[in-house]
Amino acid sequence: MPESRGSESSGSTSRRASGTQHIATPKLKDSCTACATSKVKCSKDKPTCARCTRRGLTCDYGLSKRTGRTSHATAQKQQQQRQQQQQSQQEAADRRVSQSAVPVANMLPDVDEFISPMSLQESSILSPTLMPDLSTSGSQAGLDQWNSDLWSTMFAPNEPSSNNTPANTMQTHGGNGNDIDHLFNDLTSYSMLGEPTDTAMSNQHTHTFSDTSSSISPFDQLTSVSDMGSQDFSNIDLSMTNCTPAIQQSVEPANCCLTVALGFMTQLCATASSSCTMPGSHNGNTTLPTIDSVITENRQIVDQIVKILECPCSHDEYLLTIVHLVVFKVMAWYAAAAREKPSLAEEINWTDQQSGRPRSRTHSEEVLRFPPSIDGYSSDGSDNGRMAAQLVLSELHRVQRLVNLLSQRLEGVRLRNHVASSGSSSSLESIGEDSVVGVSLSATAGSPLSSPTFDQLEADLRKRLRAVSFETIDVLRRS
């Protein structure tokens, strides 16, 4: 009997506990909504707290939102809902594809009522009714009509961007152009040497341009390197030269600025000592130019390079690169003319006794040490080195003016590259039209060389000019 009573009591207790668990009331918040909103302490009196009673407010205790991990059943339910949502979206997309395929399916012969997207794609690719006839004479018109939006998108102009860089950020990195003027004034007497009579560098040349066009093959305008080397480019008059490209206008090869610059480079390298082993390299030609011929030739080349830089085609970066090389070669010949005569041991060791070929010298430019003449006066041989150095030093002012003019052209290249990189027309207005005249911004979009490359070329050019000046002055000091 006691055991049966104990079991009945335990069973009733468990039933009451389970019933209580099923009908448990939700937990309310400790603070009412009015006190929680005002952020004051609530007396927690139910059904109305003391503050709400005093103020006559509606006291409402909200349900407490229990935090914690989501139960496993709830997680599965959420995952099923996401899968159902994705499936419904996929079905809606398939319905849209099938609805859009109905007009095309009606155009195709013998097509079932229910067409799949894959079969529709294959039919649209292989069907001759949907593709333009590219074999006919009107293929281009059919292609434009078939996909006009594609061409309009591909060739749409770029929208200009805002200019956020001032023009004064572009600076020349070549140094001061007048850094060697004092060297000429201190160590050289210009009254003895005489002022050069050639005034071609100070003349202003007028260029006439015409917009004539003719279909001439660019291959007809080319000149071989061997023919170019045999021509004398120093006497070419570029004052009235039209430097329109050969594909647009019939221009003589010798009158194009780029061809003339290449001719100068070939002409300056033709008399240089070289140990080239290629066939036809003219190693047997040992004739060296005299100092007078070097001075005369360099003077003519410098004058012609100035005319090239005054031409509108000097905005071409390829031409400016060739002009840099020509100026480097001109200064190399000036240095060779001012250099002291090599010793007898150097002259004997210049030829390799075993092969009989001339070996590479320290300097590729060599001149014949014939006494130079200044205004018809030549020395007896004792002052040859000093006269040559004075003559070279008097000619370096031409090179300095040429470097300054070339620096202006390089500044224009840097400004154009800056404007093209920013892509803003307002940048052009702030910089000025004079700096970028003659070249459209679209032509500078694909610049072959970067601005730092030209900066380094200009810096090396001025450095080389200083070196030649100091070498020449050093010869004058020792003689």
From Swiss-Prot:
Subcellular locations according to the entry: Nucleus
GO biological process: aflatoxin biosynthetic process
CDD domains recorded: GAL4
DNA-binding region as annotated in the record: 32-59
RNA-binding is among the record's keywords: no
Keyword Zinc: yes
Protein's recorded name: Dothistromin biosynthesis regulatory protein aflR
Gene that this polypeptide is encoded by: aflR
